[in-house]
Amino acid sequence: MNIKPEEITSIIKSQIEGYESKLETVDSGTIIEIGDGIARIYGLQNCMAGELLEFPNDVYGMALNLEQDNVGCVLLGSEEGIKEGDIVKSTGKVVEVPVGEEMLGRVVNALGQPIDGKGPIKAEDSKPVDIKATGVIDRQSVNQPLQTGIKAIDSMIPIGKGQRELIIGDRQTGKTAIAIDTILNQKGKDVICIYVAIGQKQSTVAHIVNTFEEMGAMDYSIVVAATASDSAPLQYLAPYSGVTIAENFMFKGKDVLIVYDDLSKHAVAYRTMSLLLRRPPGREAYPGDVFYLHSRLLERAAKLSQKLGGGSITALPIIETLAGDVAGYIPTNVISITDGQIFLESELFYAGQRPAVNSGISVSRVGGSAQIKAMKKLSGTLRLELAQYRELAAFAQFGSDLDKESKKRLEKGKRLTEMMKQPQYKPMPVEKQIMILYAVVNEYVMDIDVSKLSAFESGLFEYVDAHYRDLGKQILEKKELTDDISSQLTKAINEYKKIFLAEEQ
């Protein structure tokens, strides 16, 4: 084999001609102060707001304060082994979270990393966590119902797809229970659910995940968890990560339900971060932009126009009040951002009225237009009747003689209140809600003892399933109480009532 020297020289010459000298410059700075998960860095002249910064030991931080001669940064990991004088590099990127179908059925942290021990997630894409909400032109008004499976809510405080409905109440009044029941009720309805746990105990999150797995809800759900043991920056990021994952599905034309549990702890995490960054405190020591913190998050829930696929994000933020004080700073902020609120009362809860929804203060500002006609017709006077009942019940405590009409109202009110009770993890399909509502509202159950009403309810459903099999299907298809459906319902209720009363004797 002959090797010609000319060939070798020509190859070397072409290599030399094609050589490009590449110098990679990285903007870097020096840590001048570190502690409590906050670092101050000197240098980083070209740093962006919210930029991801690379620290030693593979730890990343997020630049939040851009000051004249230094950058205030929150660490998204442990500060162990990082000290003053260490070099910090800018990455030119902002915080992103993985998105896509692969996230379904997984439990992830605020950065979208799996924490359920089921291996890595091969996500199709990643998106920045903090982006601008969809504009007004790209939205349409709320027009489809999102059934929670809870009688008190679906009848009096209806929620539509694309709505933001606040769940507010003291601790231990069943706020999370309502959110979980709503997620369980989406089974088979082609709605993707995202549960964001902020500042909760790990045991609580584990219990919720177990419930989802037992009930088969994990197939269409994603859990984003920033627990009490996580740092304030991760608790701050969690809801934004959750809604970014949700937006990816929404822009593909899908319906998403997202629960933020809860935004009170989110505001506290942001306050912690802001005070450590030495931002000036305002009312209750919260920073001045705490309203914007929640408004930019909740404005990302929307019902997209048909041109963009008609997808939606329905948000259920949760706020914890102290001793029923809805006039606090964070509660009033979130009430003014959302499209209505479900107010839970501890007095009702301890009196055995569960879910403990106070229908007098609770309201849904846009859900009424999404409610199905049958439910709208039945629940039209419900709120008023319950309010009148409460007023009468308070008056009747004084033992004064009541006229016949007032006694009748009291008896009907008792049955309406009893009918609204519902066990946890037992969401009810809308057609069954309509059946029992029809029976109580039209006074077919006045001769049934209040304590026997729940037994009558479950018996009625069994009777209808056995003898009027198509009735539920007809209600779902027609979505209104036609004369035919009404007469069938009346017949079924009266037939079963005879059997029920005969058995009771």
UniProtKB/Swiss-Prot annotation:
PROSITE patterns: ATPASE_ALPHA_BETA. Its main location: membrane. Keywords: ATP synthesis, ATP-binding, Cell membrane, CF(1), Hydrogen ion transport, Ion transport, Membrane, Nucleotide-binding, Translocase, Transport. It catalyses: ATP + H2O + 4 H(+)(in) = ADP + phosphate + 5 H(+)(out). It is found in: Cell membrane. Coiled coil: none annotated. SUPFAM superfamilies: C-terminal domain of alpha and beta subunits of F1 ATP synthase (SSF47917), N-terminal domain of alpha and beta subunits of F1 ATP synthase (SSF50615), P-loop containing nucleoside triphosphate hydrolases (SSF52540). It is a peripheral membrane protein. GO terms for cellular component: plasma membrane; proton-transporting ATP synthase complex. GO terms for molecular function: ADP binding; ATP binding; proton-transporting ATP synthase activity, rotational mechanism. ATP binds at residues 169-176. Pfam families: ATP-synt_ab, ATP-synt_ab_C, ATP-synt_ab_N. It comes from the Bacteria. Its EC number is 7.1.2.2. It is an enzyme of class 7 (translocase). The keyword Cell membrane applies. The keyword NAD does not apply. The record marks 362 as: Required for activity. F-type ATPases have 2 components, CF(1) - the catalytic core - and CF(0) - the membrane proton channel. CF(1) has five subunits: alpha(3), beta(3), gamma(1), delta(1), epsilon(1). CF(0) has three main subunits: a(1), b(2) and c(9-12). The alpha and beta chains form an alternating ring which encloses part of the gamma chain. CF(1) is attached to CF(0) by a central stalk formed by the gamma and epsilon chains, while a peripheral stalk is formed by the delta and b chains. Belongs to the ATPase alpha/beta chains family. Produces ATP from ADP in the presence of a proton gradient across the membrane. The alpha chain is a regulatory subunit. This is ATP synthase subunit alpha. It comes from Clostridium acetobutylicum (strain ATCC 824 / DSM 792 / JCM 1419 / IAM 19013 / LMG 5710 / NBRC 13948 / NRRL B-527 / VKM B-1787 / 2291 / W). The lineage of its organism: Bacteria, Bacillati, Bacillota, Clostridia, Eubacteriales.
